[in-house]
Swiss-Prot record:
Gene name linked to the record: pyrG
UniProtKB keywords: ATP-binding, Glutamine amidotransferase, Ligase, Magnesium, Metal-binding, Nucleotide-binding, Pyrimidine biosynthesis
PANTHER family given in the database record: CTP SYNTHASE (PTHR11550), CTP SYNTHASE-RELATED (PTHR11550:SF0)
Sequence positions that bind CTP: S13, D146, I147, E148, K186, T187, K188, P189, T190, Q191, K222
Binding site for UTP: S13, K186, T187, K188, P189, T190, Q191, K222
Protein name, as recorded: CTP synthase
Similarity field: Belongs to the CTP synthase family.
Length: 545
């Protein structure tokens, strides 16, 4: 039978439940177990796809086309695996599924209630993930005591009894605040949080304590005694120089001992040699390179979580620190040539990230033009590719009114236009118009890209076919391909249907733009190749360009 580890959070949010969950899963995976993960989000949205980046942070896209919580990205990067739609679900999805069943008559006229119908649907989804693995780690979003989370806590409480006490474990992530004025660490918030869990019928088997200061032995013993857990199951989680250090910190505290004891796993000895080697490269690299990151959601940098991690991973594998120079695209709109020189003077590469809407677009166009004219290595992603084509069409082809239909539906030169027909990740034909609903209507998930030999994109991938993930409604208009090629911008990647997937400049040290999101396939142990090529060429350029 599969084993279950449920990770809850107390006191307040953003304590690092996702990293804690991923770290535990990683240690178990490196101990030889087949591990998967689930993230439960208690909000009523069906998925985060239509939520503002400022509200939710990044929307992570899986191989099978799900728009998910950014923690799914953390799980994939830690476990070096691909997850999917079944690994993330929300209150909205649960209620929608139950209501659809009720409308079909699946409940045979019964009154539909939280218990058993909602809780049964939650348990069914968790069990579905557990079917093919040894251990599933389930992170429950939110904080204990939130009204939205009660059905989920009840469901996992029931599940524990169904699978038996040696097949389920509860890990509670909590805060031990340090009061500077008193010079003391305080345990009372954690004690109250555990009491709240107990009222629901759950007693945690382990505490993971976020803290600014190391926890004295006496304080750990106090927590263990007051919360009724074993003393070796109080784990401290101090801030680390990188999140990838956290599994190693946990391992140094023998976190697997109480886990193995509770789940009857035997002696565990994870091999973290390769992991430790990469972490050292992240913390103490020999070289450095500065990259300008041009975006429009910089107030919440978690909007670009996967891309930031991809740069870090590429740097680690090149023994290099990637210093990110954050540049708000709206600030560039007001900048003259002298100001642009000042902004980009010390950077060795320019990255223009994806986004939606017209805000900040003119600033991104200025950054792209600067990279093109000054021979600075450039990577454009999603909108960053579309704008690279618009900039080239306006300033090199002389098409003054070249634009995207996203910003000007009536543009006379639609070099970027709405994808009105495509085959989705499940093989189904999809039709779209400007009036189609926003939720779940984009080109989503992994698609094949055929790479043209003799291009920089081919040099990066060393393959003529790759699978990368997409999240977009608009696409470069293939009708302009010949005109672009004649002036030096070539299409270096296309989809099965012939959609433009990548463009690059022939007479430039390294100018590549892609419609897909390479950051979504990036992993700690296997960085995305086009992002790593960008970082590598930016470093080369700072020394020779």
């Amino acid at each position: 039978m599969s084993k279950y580890i449920f990770v809850t959070g107390g006191v307040l949010s953003s304590l690092g439940k996702g990293i804690t969950s991923a770290s535990i899963a990683t240690l178990l995976q490196h101990s030889g177990f087949k591990v998967s993960m689930v993230k439960i989000d208690p909000y009523i949205n069906v998925d985060p796809g239509t939520m503002s980046p400022f509200e939710h942070g990044e929307v992570f896209v899986t191989e099978d086309g799900a728009e998910t919580d950014l923690d799914i990205g953390n799980y994939e990067r830690f476990l070096n695996t691909n997850l999917g739609k079944k690994n993330n679900f929300t209150t909205g999805q649960i209620y929608l599924s139950v209501i659809e069943k009720e409308r079909r008559g699946d409940y045979l006229g019964k009154t539909v209630q939280i218990i058993p119908h909602i809780t049964d649907e939650i348990k069914r989804r968790i069990k579905e993930v557990a079917k093919d693995v040894d251990i599933v780690v389930v992170e429950l979003g939110g904080t204990v005591g939130d009204i939205e989370g009660l059905p989920f806590l009840e469901a996992v409480r029931q599940l524990k009894h169904e699978v038996g006490k040696t097949n389920a474990m509860f890990v509670h992530v909590t805060l031990i605040p340090y009061i500077k004025a008193a010079g003391e660490l305080k345990t009372k918030p954690t004690q109250h949080s555990v009491q709240e869990l107990r009222r629901i019928g759950i007693t945690p088997h382990m505490l993971v304590c976020r803290t600014e200061k190391p926890l004295p032995k006496a304080l750990k013993e106090k927590l263990a005694d007051s919360c009724d857990i074993e003393r070796d199951a109080v784990i401290e989680a101090v801030d680390a120089p990188t999140v990838y250090q956290v599994p190693l910190n946990f391992l140094n505290q023998d976190i697997l001992v109480p886990i193995a004891k509770q789940l009857d796993l035997g002696d565990l000895h994870p091999d973290m040699t390769e992991w430790n080697f990469i972490v050292k490269k992240i913390i103490s690299p020999q070289k450095s390179v500065k990259i300008a990151f041009v975006g429009k959601y910089l107030q919440l940098k978690e909007s670009y979580k996967s891309l930031i991690e991809a740069l870090i991973h590429s740097g680690a594998h090149l023994d290099m620190k990637v210093d990110i120079e954050w540049i708000d695209s709206e600030d560039l709109e007001k900048a003259d040539d002298e100001k642009l020189d000042e902004i980009f003077n010390e950077v060795s590469g320019i990255l223009v990230a994806g986004g939606f809407g017209e805000r900040g677009v003119e600033g991104k166009l200025k950054a792209i033009k600067y990279a093109r004219e000054n021979k600075i290595p450039y990577l454009g992603i999603c909108l960053g590719m579309q704008l690279a084509v618009i900039e080239f069409a306006r300033n090199v082809l002389g098409l003054e009114y070249a634009n995207s239909q996203e910003f000007d539906p009536d543009t006379p030169e639609p070099v970027v236009y709405l994808i009105d027909e495509f085959i989705d990740a499940s093989g189904q034909k999809q039709l779209r118009t400007h009036k189609s609903p926003l939720g779940g209507t984009m080109r989503l998930g992994g698609y094949e890209c055929f790479v043209k030999k003799g291009t920089k994109l081919y040099d990066a991938y060393k393959s003529d076919k790759v699978i990368e993930r997409h999240r977009h409604r608009y696409e470069v208009n293939g009708a302009y391909e010949d005109a672009l090629k004649e002036k030096g911008m070539i299409v270096s990647g296309k989809s099965v249907e012939g959609l433009v997937e990548a463009v690059e400049l022939k007479d430039h040290p390294w100018f590549v733009a892609v419609q897909f999101h390479p950051e979504f396939t990036n992993k700690l142990k296997s960085p995305n190749k086009v992002i790593m090529s960008f970082v590598e060429n930016a470093y080369k350029c700072q020394r020779s360009c």
